[in-house]
Amino acid sequence: MSFRGGGRGGFNRGGGGGGFNRGGSSNHFRGGGGGGGGGNFRGGGRGGFGRGGGRGGFNKGQDQGPPERVVLLGEFLHPCEDDIVCKCTTDENKVPYFNAPVYLENKEQIGKVDEIFGQLRDFYFSVKLSENMKASSFKKLQKFYIDPYKLLPLQRFLPRPPGEKGPPRGGGRGGRGGGRGGGGRGGGRGGGFRGGRGGGGGGFRGGRGGGFRGRGH
């Protein structure tokens, strides 16, 4: 099972009525409304966090400047072309919004969350750096920060317990997934962020094409 959302929302990058659709309106972030088994990240619900269009949510817009406070997001692992790969170390494994600004401790913005991959409770993210930043300028385990309002609890993406009622979980964030390396890009069975195509297990699979599947390199 993969990180496939459902409903009318999700993470729309380009328009249409929802889904984690990166430009069109048909092949979108699919899935069931009410959760299900397997410990995967399932989207759902209305809204979501789009890059442009959709039904509202965290849309890409003009930067509003640094937040009032920042909290720890993760640590630098290694560069990847012009981006950087980091280990997520948020409190309680909270998940950052896609495209959320990433800061140094002094609130200087270095870039934005670009991809997420790894296991559900042990995941990584890449940062698309700002034009004035160089991937080679960061040190191993250097810490990065985020606006606490740009984080969602992991529970938003887990299956709902049997018998629990309420709106579908998900509709939260995602990342393009896809595999930038890091300490465990694919992960084993049982749930996680997968960068490759096909395979068993489940969780954050990223990339182009229909659904939130692997982008490859």
Curated annotation (Swiss-Prot):
Keywords: Isopeptide bond, Nucleus, Repeat, Ribonucleoprotein, Ribosome biogenesis, RNA-binding, rRNA processing, Ubl conjugation. It comes from the Eukaryota. It holds the Pfam family Gar1. Residues 169-217 are annotated as: RGG-box 2. There is a cross-link at K134 (Glycyl lysine isopeptide (Lys-Gly) (interchain with G-Cter in SUMO2)). One of its GO terms (cellular component) is nucleoplasm. Residues 1-22, 30-59, 168-217 have a biased composition (Gly residues). Its main location: nucleus. Residues 4-57 are annotated as: RGG-box 1. GO terms for biological process: snoRNA guided rRNA pseudouridine synthesis; telomere maintenance via telomerase. Residues 1-65, 156-217 are annotated as: Disordered. It is found in: Nucleus, Nucleolus; Nucleus, Cajal body. One of its GO terms (molecular function) is telomerase RNA binding. Gene3D superfamilies: Probable tRNA pseudouridine synthase domain. Interaction with SMN1 requires at least one of the RGG-box regions. Required for ribosome biogenesis and telomere maintenance. Part of the H/ACA small nucleolar ribonucleoprotein (H/ACA snoRNP) complex, which catalyzes pseudouridylation of rRNA. This involves the isomerization of uridine such that the ribose is subsequently attached to C5, instead of the normal N1. Each rRNA can contain up to 100 pseudouridine ('psi') residues, which may serve to stabilize the conformation of rRNAs. May also be required for correct processing or intranuclear trafficking of TERC, the RNA component of the telomerase reverse transcriptase (TERT) holoenzyme. Part of the H/ACA small nucleolar ribonucleoprotein (H/ACA snoRNP) complex, which contains NHP2/NOLA2, GAR1/NOLA1, NOP10/NOLA3, and DKC1/NOLA4, which is presumed to be the catalytic subunit. The complex contains a stable core formed by binding of one or two NOP10-DKC1 heterodimers to NHP2; GAR1 subsequently binds to this core via DKC1. The complex binds a box H/ACA small nucleolar RNA (snoRNA), which may target the specific site of modification within the RNA substrate. The complex also interacts with TERC, which contains a 3'-terminal domain related to the box H/ACA snoRNAs. Belongs to the GAR1 family. This is H/ACA ribonucleoprotein complex subunit 1. It comes from Homo sapiens (Human).
